[in-house]
Amino acid sequence: MLACSLLLFAALGPSAGTKDTPPTATATAAETQPEADAAPSEASPEPSEADASDGEVNLLGRAKTGSGEGRRNENVQFNLIDNNAAKEAAIRLGTSATLVSEFAPERNYFSSELGAAPNGPVALRARTLGDWHGNVFWRHLNSATSARSFFQVGGVKPARENDYGFRVGRALWRGANFSVDASQRRIRGNVNGNVLVPRPDERTPLTDDPAERVLVQQMLDVFPTETPNRTDINERMLNTNAAQGIDDDSFTARFDQAWGDKNRVAMQYSYLQQLVDAFQLIRTQNPDTTTRSHRARITYGRTLSPTSELQLTTAFDRAASLLTPEESELETAVFVSTALTSFGNGSTIPIDRARNVFRHGALVRKTVGRHELTYGGEVFRRQVSGFEADAHRGAYSFNRAFGNDAVTNLRSGTASTYFLGVGNVHRGYRNWEGETFVGDRWSPTPGLDLNIGLRWGFLTPPTEVDELDGVAYDCDCNNFAPTFGFAYRLPHGAGRLRGGFGLHYGTIFDVTYMQIRYNSPNNAKLVIPTPDLLAPASDIDVSDLGSVRGVRYEITPELAAPYSMQYNLSWEFEPVSNWLLSLGYVGSRSPKLLAQWHLNRARIVEGIPTTLRTVNERRPDPTILDRRLVLNGSRGYFDAAKMDLTIPHWKGLSVRASYWFSKLMDLGTDYANTASNEDSWRARSQRVTDIHPDMKALSRFDSPHATLLRVAYALPRTGPRGSWRAAAFGNWTLSMVSLMKTGTPFNIEMGSDAPGLGNVDGLPGERPMLLDPSVHGATIGHPDTVLPREAFGFLEPGGAGDLGRNAFRKGPIRNVNASLARRWSLGGEAALTLRAESVNFFNTPQFAAPGTRLTDQNFGVITNTLNEGRTFRVGLDAAF
């Protein structure tokens, strides 16, 4: 269910007309005061009641600017699959400490204390419509008014973004309502970014073998002919531009019918599509992506009595993702440490996945005296099918080794490792998940409210439709989750005291268990050290995959859904009339977080040289290569103190200010870790023993200090009603959202497993020795600040670095978004709103982490930003 709570964007949001609203408060009448906490966001629609679905959708080009977020730098690439979009946002922005005022029994609040939205029942809420009403909107962003990003060379390249749509609805006949929402967004422009390319003197092969020279030249030719133009930062850095196109289409139709006062039915269908023609700063850098989502809901509601209500819902969700590599004569993926930008679209491409979820739920609400009872349940049937590569196109890794740097080894055709997947990995998995819940909200006295709830859930292991794989973990059928909370009105007007405790379960991700598809006898994952460049797998007979020595993916039989124990306490009071101040604490402990441990690493064996070439000879189990074990191998710790101040209306000004101080730690993996692909590499330990002491550190999402300020100001009328001055200067609203946060941590790695550098165990990722403790914990927040290479030392074979994980921080977030809006009333509900918005108004860069691999030339140097430069956007919204 964690997938639900991590929804970055959902197809069934509010009406299309609210999709890209800027940070301003929308007035409902000419004299309405703005609400600071109503500042909408630029991008993703917030989930509606129908969004409590199981299929997450990743989309590019969206930002929650109403929460102070800037537009992300598209050059920070991630694949639009799984929960990657949510993880990218959490790494870039950190956590947002959130106190839940009441744990509703029908909702799951796993990770909600960190800012993730809770998921809930699938039912559609009842609604009624009158005569024709709706709105039409259009918004435009143009590069002519955009500022350059920090590292950009030359002017801003042409780009434009158009977002438009409509919403319309009305009552058809007695008890019947119908509405349609539709929108499109078209982005045509250029992505600016930094890439590391060979110097002019590094554009030719060094190998003497003619055939190898051809292949090496193909690898070098993927880089643009432009020469490095930011040599002030790195001698190989090139700032350049590449075209990217994004097409978004969304459609929602809904029909409601009521029969009398007791019966009603609601039906809704939504479709969402995004097509991304990805930018290529270097050829074959990024895959093209097609994302499609279908969602259908039918809810029957019946009023059983004046004090009880029943809802029955059936739903179907389908999310399809297709990621395809750019066509090229070079089919393999290539990684050149971080000395050059990687190319070949990555080793996990292509991906062709379809996910169907059938949901059925029931919900009953009943009032008995002072008790408000809620009970019900849901059951899910999941179907996940498709093809997902794991180095099936092959992948070369060139690192600093053999006495050369990584670029020289590339030019010489001397790879450190070759990865290859061989076999059939098309699969279809099926499993069940369900939950029941009961809760009671009781008011024993006028000043005291109590709520208590209990959820029980189950999660079955998946089965493969053709019986190609067997998942060896048991049914997770003992997930009992109690909740308790209270709200007490203190005497003498001293405010209200709230507290709560809840146990909430996550889920086992599809991508977590689907890794077993890469095992023999139907597939083999090969890891070949020091391969022959032209025939890296020539010595391996792949005719019988069952006998091939490959990587083994295992899942512990005790694998279970992670869970979190969340607790909070807050005091709300009015320091002055109509002002609300809240002081609170929230914390959680999250056992059984998913992790992947890399075992069967090479040891120091007497009589065998400790080199990269002998890695596979020195593994304890001679029948396999790397052993990758998925288990509940981590634990999360979170504590935060938070203060909120709300000033609703004060001389035309509305303010909501928040500050929180928090600490987030884990034992190697966090609540969003899927224990697969890049997540598994991020969490690898230095050794196979003492893993938890080695990995315990700050989480990659940790951001201890944060301030969020929302301000909306309604400009006063300057003349009599109806005068030209009132018409020109009245009904203007100025809004501002400011987000200031400490940067999130980053990790330092050795960058090479070679003798004299790393520990030669066949797995990269070990950390260096810390020679200068004065740099420990430093913030590297500006290109003028460099992490000194001489502060770190290399390892002995079989050793481990003494530098802790995530020991340094990126620079802070200092972002301000602003907007100016004018509303004209056209009579009745008709109105026209003009809005101008700026994101990153002061053009403040948020810098990415510096180079993190000690053996690379760009170590310790910042070469990228995480946000775009300042942008302006205008929009019109006509409501009727």
Label the predicted regions.
Residues 29-294, 304-306, 318-322, 331-339, ...:
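Acidic, glycine-rich flexible loop segments
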Residues 74, 119, 132, 160-166, ...:
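Hydrophobic, lipid-facing positions within transmembrane beta-strands of outer-membrane proteins
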Residues 136-142, 180-186, 267-271, 312-318, ...:
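Transmembrane beta-barrel strands of outer-membrane/channel proteins
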Residues 333-334, 464-481, 485-631, 687, ...:
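Solvent-exposed loop/turn elements at secondary-structure boundaries
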Residues 459, 584-726, 733-741:
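Gram-negative outer-membrane beta-barrel transporters
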Residues 699-700, 718-720, 729-827, 833, ...:
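Extracytoplasmic gating/loop element in the C-terminal half of outer-membrane beta-barrel translocons
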Residues 761, 765, 808-809, 846-880:
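C-terminal beta-signal and terminal closure region of outer-membrane beta-barrel proteins
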